[in-house]
Regions:
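Transmembrane alpha-helical segments of multi-pass transport proteins
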Residues: 368-371, 417-472
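Alpha-helical transmembrane segments of multi-pass membrane transport and lipid-handling proteins
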Residues: 84-109, 189, 267, 291-342, ...
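Membrane-interface junctions at transmembrane-helix termini in multi-pass inner-membrane proteins
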Residues: 68-71, 127-150, 174, 336-367, ...
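Interhelical loop/hinge segments that connect adjacent transmembrane helices in multipass membrane
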Residues: 1-6, 145, 173, 177, ...
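Signature of the first transmembrane helix
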Residues: 5-62, 91, 95, 99, ...
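Helix-loop junctions and terminal segments of transmembrane helices
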Residues: 27-28, 57-74, 256, 260-284, ...
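Transmembrane helical elements of multi-pass membrane transporters/channels
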Residues: 9-24, 154, 179-191, 195, ...
Length: 472
């Protein structure tokens, strides 16, 4: 692949999808006056259950897509057709299960509105198969435009419908939920042409039961890894809904969590951009470079979370034109530090991917996800919805303890970090950074500007002192 092609594809896969996030931020001042914490509560609970089943429904069968493309270049479409049918059937089953659970969970209960809402909210499960195949086929054939612009068009169309329903029709949570419904239906319909027709990938019923069992045996172990991410992000809302916590309180948590999640965007983009250097340094056993790259990503994560936290009140005043939703500002300030350990996850998981020891990934995601569920289940009945804030933070930060308790990561992290005691230093920096940022978020604007300049200067000084420019 030429350098120009690499840059072009990086732009399509990395920059273009972020346009939807930019548009959603611009829309906030226009839509939030017509939304309530109850709307965000309903939306948060519904999307949590839907995300849970979206992660389970593929049954890990996507593992066969890339492998068959390279192993059977002339007939890969036959394998993909079998996978497509199995995914369509499993998504139908899990979509119906999701609808049934939502009918018993959402406050609308067994009514026509409740049934319609559960169906609309479950469509991303029913119609997820085409999008999943498209996410694999277009990068493999190096044709990003069809994938990226279909998803972008669907997302923008969904956001337009959402805006109309919220701003003009005053339909609250219906507007929030309609966005996912419209974008999913649009993408599924377009990919029928781009995937089914253009690549001759059609649903194929496999009569060979032994082959189906063999495919599932390979695929199913991947489900817990995907499920772990959902448990980390959605456990709190699922547990709160089962404990009948007020939907207004669930909405406060959901909105604060959404705003806090923006803090990880910079770190994830940096880690994605540095992935070639991360891969190369580990494969070449250049652990000194690998360690410096980690320090760079972790420092950027700390500085970004600190800056977003201290400026969060101003961000809310600028974007959130709703007094009830503005109460979630302090939640956002805390949760923007939850995934500050994302860099550590990236650098711990990279060796496992390189060595194809993917079973070890369960420790990084599934175990913290289960921890989050258990903490929420235990603490929310006692301390209310605010317990979910700390259970989420603790569960993410628990990834720092893995090198002390799991043999594989004890050896791997010691190899590239040098000394595991540095993990405790990182934890101390995270805690002190969070305490300091939350203490300073209400100081005067001129003081925040000064603090921001100091933080950026420290980041620049660290970058120069460690001579990180030579690595990137």
């Amino acid at each position: 692949m030429s350098t120009r092609k690499i840059v072009t594809n990086t732009f399509y896969y990395g920059v273009v999808p972020k346009l939807t996030m930019l548009v959603s931020i611009v829309m906030l001042p226009l839509t939030t006056p017509f939304l309530s914490t109850f709307d965000y509560g309903v939306y948060g609970v519904l999307t949590s259950y839907t995300s849970l089943f979206v992660s389970i429904a593929p049954l890990g069968l996507n593992v066969h897509l890339t492998n068959s493309y390279f192993e059977m270049p002339r007939h890969y479409n036959l394998v993909w057709g079998r996978v497509l049918l199995m995914m369509l059937l499993s998504s139908l089953c899990f979509g119906l299960v999701n609808m049934l659970i939502l009918l018993f969970t959402l406050p609308m209960g067994f009514s026509w509105e409740g049934l319609a809402l559960c169906f609309v909210g479950s469509v991303p499960i029913f119609l997820m198969a085409n999008g999943l195949l498209a996410q694999h086929i277009f990068p493999l054939v190096e044709r990003p435009k069809h994938l990226v612009f279909t998803n972008l068009s669907g997302a923008l169309l969904g956001m337009l419908v959402s805006f109309v329903l919220i701003y003009w029709c005053r339909l609250g949570y219906w507007g929030l939920i309609a966005s996912g419904f419209v974008s999913t239906v649009f993408a599924f319909s377009v990919f029928v042409k781009f995937v089914w027709h253009d690549f001759d990938i059609r649903p194929i019923w496999d009569h060979n039961k032994r082959r189906v069992r063999r495919m599932l045996k390979i695929a199913l172990p991947l489900v817990p890894h995907t499920l772990g991410f959902v448990l980390l992000t959605s456990s709190a809302r699922i547990v709160m809904s089962q404990y009948h916590v007020s939907y207004d309180e669930i909405g406060l948590f959901s909105h604060g969590s959404t705003m806090g999640d923006y803090a990880v965007v910079v770190t994830s983009a940096l880690a994605l951009a540095l992935m070639p250097q991360i891969q190369r340094s580990f494969r070449n056993s250049d652990f000194r470079a690998y360690r410096k790259l980690y320090f760079l990503c972790q420092t950027v994560a700390l500085v970004t979370s600190f800056l977003i936290c201290i400026w969060m009140p101003e961000i809310y005043r600028l974007l959130i034109r709703n007094a009830s939703l503005a109460q979630s500002c302090d939640i956002a300030c805390l949760l923007c530090f939850a995934n500050v350990v994302y860099s550590f996850y990236v650098f711990m998981s990279a060796p496992a991917f390189i060595e194809k020891n993917t079973v070890q990934l369960l420790w990084l995601v599934f175990v913290p996800g289960i921890l989050n569920f258990v903490l929420c289940y235990t603490l929310i009945p006692v301390f209310g919805y605010r317990a979910a804030i700390w259970s989420t933070i603790i569960s993410y930060w628990s990834q720092l303890s893995i090198p002390f308790v799991v043999g594989y990561y004890r050896k791997s992290v010691t190899q590239w970090l040098g000394h595991r005691g540095l993990i405790l230093v990182v934890l101390l920096l995270i805690v002190s950074n969070q305490v300091l940022a939350n203490a300073l978020m209400h100081v005067a604007v001129w003081q925040k500007i000064l603090l921001s300049l100091v933080a950026l200067a420290l980041l620049g000084g660290f970058y120069w002192q460690q001579r990180l420019g030579s690595l990137v």
